[in-house]
């Protein structure tokens, strides 16, 4: 009898429960982002404060997410973080897409940067190391991939940079870890990334002068898309608080919104009387090889004109630290063809540069960009005034692939 009554009660509870479930809407599960983002910040230089601020901006961006998402940040800077006061470590932030980060309600606008750093989960610490060493970068990236396994990965690199060059003032191409000579070439950087044996959805270069065809060529087989600036990037860098949700959602249209957010941010600063300038591009890596074929065709066809070419007729992107570092690619091709862009070249540029934007008015005014002659991609044109650059230029794979090796200059090259 007791068993029977228990059975009746259990059936009653089950029926009541079923009826309740039918009437009460259940909360929808929060979707998970398919992309995990890895940020590699080399800040043992005068960008320490700015790159720390970027971590805070990334946190703010995560707080606005409506997806579950993971962010890992490798930090190498002057500022020491955590209870062990580490200078080389990996921070982890995970949002549930419902306003919580690392299991706690996201910090509000009154929180300090130290509060944000305290909220991080420190998942790895390192002894003192040079983060711009190829093997060190590869090891750290492999650690990050292991710590946050994902089928899709995105990369952010933040530091100083100088496009393909091995020298502007120092040996910098990317990064500056302490002394000026503690830097790395982009070929080594590309190899360090490639050796993780992962294909990345995107690389966002929060660093100067990385929006050149030489850089795009170097990273073409490593990631699907490249987001970069052909000019210097202001010290604040990219406004991560405005676009993390787009980076995590992926696809071309969202990456375009990332680029637009960058220019909108600096346009707002300019409109309010602040120092501001910006160039940004979205590059389709799989189309870079086809673009290089078109470039080579044009360089070889016009090699006599290029033998003693006057670069002063072109829009230059090295406004202060890097005179001669990059000129507008499409404007060069147009000038070589009497002011007309060949149809095949123009068509390929549209396939390769999926988005471009800039500030036509800037502060200082010398950083303003002529939109009519801005194609979203720069190119180095050998000039007599840069003999050391030229010597190094001839060692690059790009030198042959682009057709520059077939130009006989009217000066010692």
Segments (PLM) and residue ranges:
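Active-site groove signature of glycoside hydrolases
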Residues: 148-164
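Short acidic, gly/pro-rich beta-turn/loop elements at beta-sheet edges
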Residues: 47-49, 81-83, 165, 215, ...
């Amino acid at each position: 009898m007791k068993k029977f009554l228990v059975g009746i009660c259990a059936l009653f509870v089950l029926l009541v429960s079923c009826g309740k479930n039918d009437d009460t809407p259940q909360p929808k599960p929060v979707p998970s982002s398919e992309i995990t983002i890895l940020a590699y910040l080399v800040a043992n230089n005068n960008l320490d404060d700015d790159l720390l601020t970027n971590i805070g901006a990334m946190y703010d961006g995560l707080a606005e997410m409506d997806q579950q998402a993971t962010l890992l940040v490798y930090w190498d800077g002057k500022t020491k973080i955590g209870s062990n006061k580490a200078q080389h470590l990996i921070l982890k932030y995970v949002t549930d897409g419902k306003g919580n980060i690392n299991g706690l309600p996201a910090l509000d606008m009154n929180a300090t940067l130290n509060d944000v750093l305290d909220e991080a989960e420190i998942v790895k610490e390192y002894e003192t190391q040079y983060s711009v060493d190829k093997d060190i970068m590869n090891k750290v990236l492999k650690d990050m991939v292991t710590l946050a396994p994902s089928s899709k990965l995105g990369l952010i690199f933040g530091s100083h940079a100088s496009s393909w060059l091995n020298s502007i003032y120092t040996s910098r191409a990317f990064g500056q870890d302490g002394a000026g000579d503690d830097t790395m070439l982009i070929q080594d950087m590309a190899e360090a990334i490639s050796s993780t044996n992962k294909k990345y959805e995107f690389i966002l270069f929060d660093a100067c002068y990385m929006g050149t065809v030489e850089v795009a060529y170097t990273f073409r087989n490593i990631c699907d898309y490249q987001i970069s600036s052909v000019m210097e990037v202001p010290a604040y860098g990219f406004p991560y608080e405005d676009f993390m949700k787009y980076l995590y959602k992926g696809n071309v249209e969202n990456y375009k919104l990332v680029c637009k957010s960058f220019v909108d941010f600096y346009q707002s600063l300019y409109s309010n009387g602040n120092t501001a300038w910006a160039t940004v591009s979205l590059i389709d890596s799989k189309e870079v090889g086809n673009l290089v074929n078109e470039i080579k065709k044009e360089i070889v066809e016009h090699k006599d004109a290029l033998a003693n070419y006057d670069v002063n007729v072109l829009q230059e992107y090295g406004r202060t630290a890097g005179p001669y570092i990059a000129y507008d690619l499409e404007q060069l091709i147009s000038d070589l063809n009497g002011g007309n862009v060949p149809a095949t070249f123009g068509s390929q540029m549209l396939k390769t540069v999926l988005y471009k934007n800039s500030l036509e008015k800037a502060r200082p005014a010398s950083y303003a960009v002529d939109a009519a002659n801005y194609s979203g991609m720069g190119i180095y044109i050998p000039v007599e005034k840069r003999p050391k650059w030229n010597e190094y230029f001839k060692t690059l794979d790009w030198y042959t692939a682009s057709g520059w090796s077939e130009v006989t200059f009217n000066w010692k090259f």
